[in-house]
Design a protein with these regions (language model features):
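Acidic donor-binding loop of glycosyltransferase active sites
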Residues: 283-293
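C-terminal alpha-helical cap of glycosyltransferases
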Residues: 365-383
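Conserved donor-nucleotide binding/catalytic region of nucleotide-linked donor-dependent transferases
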Residues: 331, 336, 344-365
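Catalytic binding pocket for nucleotide-activated donors in carbohydrate/polymer assembly enzymes
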Residues: 297, 301-341
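Active-site-proximal region of nucleotide-activated glycan assembly enzymes
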Residues: 140-194, 198-202
Length: 383
């Protein structure tokens, strides 16, 4: 199958010049990056006069039960049986099997059609590639009016065929290596725009703050491993002189309860459960440890905090590991012993020379204002 036809779309003919221009953002819960990008863009548009943005997870709206099941299955697959997800990623990347599934998405397409007819958007943003195929089909068939379509690509460097072949007027990517990878895969270079990943608008202000003083050097750890592994990491890091550890367990209540009872003094580290203060916690830290998820990696880049990647999902997250290595902004360490040693070398050896080098490299490529700049780019072409 050839690549779907590209080309600029005319401005929406149904826009009301008196009312705010509607921006429709389509997202999904398969991974954090899609939703993060969508929410952050909406947050920016809320403060832009003349625009009104809405975020829709049409998968959930059409069939909430099935969507939740698929999200749980996705999370189990990437965490417990990653070989399954790797095989799935490979099949969709190397074969045209995805295109064969499009006729089965009739309900999803109908829901998008209803929203587009009701809202009459000045522009559409998709943060998940499936929507891009359905949107183009609706526009080309004349079922909905055409308007500019912006696709926010939430992966880096290792870009699946489903993204590369997805039709859009503009592909908005996080960095130059991703733009190069997509162009090499056949995406017209002139439709790729490097604007950075749209992280929370809060990062724009947080990035202006000075680094926290040290020592002690503040390490932020977002674990995604077993209690046994996490316990070893916490014991090892709290034993390092000159290190203060903060652990965020998120929604993993069992892990939170386990760490509260761990045989180390609670005074040696800080413990948080679910929090909406991740931007602030990153800004208050010197180094981050966590999985190579698209959203969190881009947040560490935005705030210029080096990262130790402790877990990688085969497929799309491999690109984030490659990105970090290319930038010289961190390292991969997937065992407790490797994590502890990586922290020791980076922060405590030779006056923290390695950490300082990582940080300097990040400062050259940081995009803390990416959400605002992306929204401004969309707004300018939707006017």
């Amino acid at each position: 199958m050839g690549r779907p036809k590209q080309g600029r779309r005319p401005l929406c003919a149904n826009c009301d010049p008196v009312s705010d221009k509607k921006i429709l953002i389509f997202t999904t819960g398969f991974g954090d990056g899609h939703n993060s990008a969508a929410r952050n863009l909406k947050d920016v548009f809320e403060h832009m006069p003349g625009f009104d943005a809405e975020v829709h997870d049409t998968y959930v709206e059409v069939n909430p039960g099935a969507s939740r099941f698929l999200q749980v299955a996705y999370n189990i697959s990437i965490q417990r049986v990653p070989v399954t997800w790797k095989a799935f990623f490979h099949v969709f990347d190397k074969t045209p099997v995805f295109e064969a599934t499009l006729p089965t998405l009739g309900k999803l397409k109908a829901a998008m059609r209803a929203l587009l007819l009701e809202k009459k958007p000045a522009a559409v943003v998709t943060t998940y590639p499936v929507y891009s195929y359905l949107l183009r089909a609706l526009m080309e068939s004349g079922e909905v009016a055409t308007c500019p379509h912006f696709m926010v690509v939430t992966d880096s460097i290792v870009i699946n065929r489903v993204w590369n072949r997805a039709p859009a007027d503009w592909d908005l990517v996080a960095n130059e290596p991703t733009a190069d990878a997509m162009a090499e895969a056949g995406v017209p270079r002139e439709k790729i725009k490097v604007l950075g990943f749209p992280v929370s608008p809060r990062f724009e202000e947080l990035a202006k703050r000075p680094l926290p003083p040290g020592p002690p050097w503040k390490i932020l750890y977002l674990p995604s491993a077993s209690r046994r592994t996490v316990g070893k990491v916490v014991r090892g890091l709290t034993a390092l002189e000159g290190i203060h550890l903060t652990v965020v367990t998120g929604r993993h209540r069992h892990l939170h309860d386990f760490l509260k009872k761990l045989d180390v003094p609670m005074s040696s580290f800080s413990l948080h459960g679910w929090t909406d203060r991740m931007p602030e916690l990153l800004a208050e830290s010197h180094l981050f440890i966590g999985k190579a998820g698209g959203a969190i990696v881009q947040e560490t880049l935005a705030i210029a905090r080096p990262m130790i990647i402790s877990h990688v999902v085969a497929g799309q997250e491999e690109g984030n590991v490659e990105l970090l290595a290319d930038l010289g902004a961190g390292t991969l360490a997937t065992t407790p012993e490797a994590i502890i040693e990586a922290v020791r070398v980076a922060m405590l050896e030779s006056g923290g020379a390695r950490w300082k080098r990582w940080r300097e490299n990040l400062q050259r490529v940081s995009h803390p204002a990416a959400a605002r700049q992306t929204a401004e780019f969309i707004a300018a072409l939707s006017a």
